[in-house]
């Protein structure tokens, strides 16, 4: 069959704040897929440079010189309103603005990008990594999210998957995925805690596992706590120290800030294995006296002091999770560490103090979540048998009722999928309509919780206050995404909605973004093809000039002149930035003329064979080896005065060695 078949594999993607990772089930085992750059994780960074969109390592490499157009840690903004991200905005060098309906947007070059679009670019990179490995198109995925992500953030992540061209079969919490990876081959019943401190969020989940059943008992966390915050305390310290030394405030210099961010991240990582680290940033800035260099020493003890408040913030969620699970710390059999920040020795000490045991360091904190996502993909695809995952919702869901009160319908840590119904009524006589305001959170008053949606139930028949019977149904699917309906018993009139992300992405906007992503993919492909044609033309010029130089005595002067003319045509096309077709045409013409070198030399060899006494001594067997290729050399080619291998048109030119 010539038609390329789509993969039956459901890939697992850990869409992280700092790094992302993709995995797939192979032969009953989850395998992390290495990227085209040769890495097992990819930076979750997207940059815009001219007409190019860079993702991953290429985006990270140019961040220092292009901080305003390099978007990192955008996961901290997904599914959130501008009013909710005040602390996050202060930590990024790029512009964050409020969209038309209060959404977070990133203005760049006159366009406004949403966090979903940026997340989609990272997911496209993960998708392409999997496709390159599997050798077939991939359309289905399981994507992980922090356990403490609310409904809006989960729905936004699913939308990002759709924009990337993926059918998101399941959204699962990161700690749950880690538990799957850890417990898939474990025998016996165990209660485990998953302590997940990543780049942007902190989660703690308590699970019971046994006989292939993974049941989440409780979850808690802080979506405003992660590795970025630890970087920030180092950056703040560096700025203060430099100001003391030089009297210069680096906080207003975006390029310097990006360099400090990179230095802070490097120092943080090094201090997990060393007691101190040197921070050297030459030419960080300059004043009237010349360039200034930043040179500092940061000890592990001082870093722990700087970050002590952040580490302390992990304690309360752990204690709440244990209380919600109705367990004592001594009931926990194993504690898994997930997320890069869990490598910090002070963090591990806190985990030990909370749970009274050494945490398990047997899983790779950077890869275990993607591995778990791939296992869940295997479960959904039928490749993994006898595994049942019972997850929970992290926060209570309810509606606003009379007096601005939050009335919960589904309590936090309820196992999903689930459906809950409750009867409500009107607050005034002959009330023709009710507005259902859907809330998520744990506070008693509606205004203190997060509004995740609202809709109206209209045309209620006139009746005294309290008489109409309005049945409100909350239906939560396996992704933890909420569907709400309200039905008037008297009229049978019903209104239902799927709670959209608070980012406010409507279906037509998602479709536009899907089309934009596809269009960008095509444009990127064209740009790559154009670049390949230019590079090939440039190589062709080099090879043609080398062939003329090396074999000038063996080919007619007229042919040399023809080839030189064609070389100039290609060079002019490149210099004038001619269309790709014109460059290719000129390059192909040069290629055809280069083949004439072989023909001329074979003709000369025939003549030489007929009159060996009169002409130069040319071995016809050697000439049979002469050939020319339009392709660049492959493998290792050696070159010397006596022995030279040039690949030029499906034929290799080999000079006869001088004995």
Swiss-Prot record:
Residues 571-592 have a biased composition (Basic and acidic residues). The keyword ATP-binding applies. CDD domains: ASKHA_NBD_HSP70_DnaK-like. The modification Phosphothreonine is found at residue 201. Residues 571-659 are annotated as: Disordered. InterPro entries: ATPase_NBD, Chaperone_DnaK, Heat_shock_70_CS, HSP70_C_sf, HSP70_peptide-bd_sf, Hsp_70_fam. GO terms for molecular function: ATP binding; ATP-dependent protein folding chaperone; unfolded protein binding. Induction: By stress conditions e.g. heat shock. Keywords: ATP-binding, Chaperone, Nucleotide-binding, Phosphoprotein, Stress response. Residues 600-613 have a biased composition (Low complexity). PANTHER family: HEAT SHOCK PROTEIN 70KDA (PTHR19375). Belongs to the heat shock protein 70 family. Acts as a chaperone. This is Chaperone protein DnaK. It comes from Chlamydia abortus (strain DSM 27085 / S26/3). The lineage of its organism: Bacteria, Pseudomonadati, Chlamydiota, Chlamydiia, Chlamydiales.
């Amino acid at each position: 069959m010539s038609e390329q078949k789509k993969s039956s594999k459901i890939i697992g993607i850990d869409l992280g704040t700092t790094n992302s990772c993709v995995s797939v089930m192979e032969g009953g085992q989850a395998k992390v897929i290495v990227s085209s750059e040769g890495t097992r994780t990819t930076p979750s960074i997207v940059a815009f440079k001219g007409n190019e969109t860079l993702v991953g390592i290429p985006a990270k490499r140019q961040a220092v010189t292009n901080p305003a157009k390099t978007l990192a840690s955008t996961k901290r903004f997904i599914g959130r309103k501008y009013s909710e991200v005040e602390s996050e905005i202060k930590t990024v060098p790029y512009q964050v603005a409020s969209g038309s309906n209060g959404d977070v947007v990133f203005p760049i070059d006159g366009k406004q990008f949403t966090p979903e679009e940026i997340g989609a670019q990272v997911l496209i990179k993960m998708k392409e990594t999997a496709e390159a490995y599997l050798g077939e198109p991939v359309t289905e995925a399981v994507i992980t999210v922090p356990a403490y992500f609310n409904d809006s953030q989960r729905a936004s992540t699913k939308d990002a998957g759709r924009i990337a061209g993926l059918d998101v079969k399941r959204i699962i919490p990161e700690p749950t995925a880690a538990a799957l990876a850890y417990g898939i081959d474990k025998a016996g019943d165990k209660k485990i805690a998953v302590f997940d401190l990543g780049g942007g969020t902190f989660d703690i989940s308590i699970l019971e596992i046994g006989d292939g059943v993974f049941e989440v008992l409780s979850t808690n966390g802080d979506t405003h706590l992660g590795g970025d915050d630890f970087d920030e305390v180092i950056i703040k310290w560096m700025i203060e120290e430099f100001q003391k030394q030089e009297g210069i405030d680096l906080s207003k210099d975006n390029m310097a800030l990006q360099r400090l961010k990179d230095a802070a991240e490097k120092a943080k990582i090094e201090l997990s294995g060393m007691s101190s680290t040197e921070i050297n940033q030459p030419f960080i800035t300059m004043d009237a006296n010349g360039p200034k260099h930043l040179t500092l020493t940061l000890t592990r003890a001082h870093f722990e002091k700087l970050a002590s408040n952040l580490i302390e913030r992990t304690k309360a969620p752990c204690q709440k999770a244990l209380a919600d699970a109705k367990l004592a710390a001594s009931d926990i059999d194993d504690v898994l560490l997930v997320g890069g920040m869990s490598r910090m020795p002070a963090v591990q000490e806190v985990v030990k103090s909370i749970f009274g045991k050494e945490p398990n360091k047997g899983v790779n904190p950077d890869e275990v979540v993607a591995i778990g996502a791939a296992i869940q993909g295997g479960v959904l695809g039928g490749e993994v048998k006898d595994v049942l995952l019972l997850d929970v919702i992290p926060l209570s869901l309810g509606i606003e009722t009379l007096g601005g009160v939050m009335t919960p319908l589904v309590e936090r840590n309820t196992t999903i999928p689930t459906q809950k119904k409750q009867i409500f009524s009107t607050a005034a006589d002959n009330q023709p309509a009710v507005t259902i305001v859907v809330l998520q959170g744990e506070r008693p008053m509606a205004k203190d919780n997060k509004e995740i949606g609202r809709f109206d139930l209209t045309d209620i028949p006139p009746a005294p206050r309290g008489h109409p019977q309005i049945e409100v149904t909350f239906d939560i699917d396996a992704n933890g995404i909420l569907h709400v309906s309200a039905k008037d018993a008297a009229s049978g009139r019903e209104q239902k909605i799927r709670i959209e992300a608070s980012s406010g992405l409507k279906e037509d906007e998602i479709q536009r973004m899907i089309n934009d992503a596809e269009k960008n993919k095509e444009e990127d492909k064209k740009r790559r093809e154009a670049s390949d044609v230019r590079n090939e033309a440039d190589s062709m010029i080099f090879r043609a000039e080398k062939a003329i130089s090396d074999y000038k005595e063996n080919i007619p002067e007229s042919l040399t002149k023809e080839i030189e003319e064609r070389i100039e045509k290609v060079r002019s096309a490149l210099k004038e930035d001619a269309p790709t077709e014109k460059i290719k045409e000129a390059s192909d013409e040069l290629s055809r003329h280069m083949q004439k070198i072989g023909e001329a030399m074979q003709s000369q060899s025939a003549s030489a064979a007929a009159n060996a006494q009169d002409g130069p001594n040319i071995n016809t067997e050697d000439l049979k080896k002469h050939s020319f290729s339009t392709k660049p050399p492959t493998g290792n080619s050696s070159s010397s005065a006596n022995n030279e291998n040039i690949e030029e048109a499906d034929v290799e030119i080999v000079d006869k060695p001088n004995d």
